[in-house]
């Protein structure tokens, strides 16, 4: 279970992590600057297992992999959004960051306590006593996430061979 950090529509990668930090390659260092201009308290207050919740087109803008890397390094459980920019979605899956699509994110408020049942495909809003369905991921994407990202998934395929 974790806290919802609520954001709006069209959160672009420059808002997630500013371009001036692209010289940093350590995810833990990047995590210190996530949403720095939009919500300066985020990096200091986010806890392992929390959720970033947003509207439409999350991760739009430039295709930098630093954005999902920085988010993952904060310890969040997942990003929950109505929709994603395609390249952000792919980058997130590739590095093992859970990205969930839910059309009912408007019902989630900042600070709500959430829990996700990945098997049932449901988000439980413990604060409001509500449930919201998530769009199921194809099995091969679930397997990539379970392995921790595309590199680990590829290693597991090689080990199976």
Curated annotation (Swiss-Prot):
* PANTHER family, per the entry: 3-ISOPROPYLMALATE DEHYDRATASE SMALL SUBUNIT 1, 3-ISOPROPYLMALATE DEHYDRATASE SMALL SUBUNIT 2-RELATED-RELATED
Which reaction does this chain catalyze? (2R,3S)-3-isopropylmalate = (2S)-2-isopropylmalate
Q: Please explain the role this protein plays, according to its UniProt record.
A: Catalyzes the isomerization between 2-isopropylmalate and 3-isopropylmalate, via the formation of 2-isopropylmaleate.
The Enzyme Commission number assigned here is 4.2.1.33
- Cite the annotated pathway: Amino-acid biosynthesis; L-leucine biosynthesis; L-leucine from 3-methyl-2-oxobutanoate: step 2/4
| Organism phylogeny | Archaea, Methanobacteriati, Methanobacteriota, Archaeoglobi, Archaeoglobales
* UniProt cross-references to InterPro entries, sorted A to Z: Aconitase/3IPM_dehydase_swvl, AconitaseA/IPMdHydase_ssu_swvl, IPMI_Swivel, LeuD, LeuD_type2/HacB/DmdB
Give the family, as the similarity comment puts it: Belongs to the LeuD family. LeuD type 2 subfamily.
GO BP annotations of the record are: L-leucine biosynthetic process
Q: How does it assemble?
A: Heterodimer of LeuC and LeuD.
> Which Pfam family name is an example for this entry?
Aconitase_C
Q: Under the GO molecular function aspect, what terms does this record hold? A: 3-isopropylmalate dehydratase activity
Keyword Disulfide bond annotated = no
Would you tell me the protein name for this molecule? Answer: 3-isopropylmalate dehydratase small subunit 1
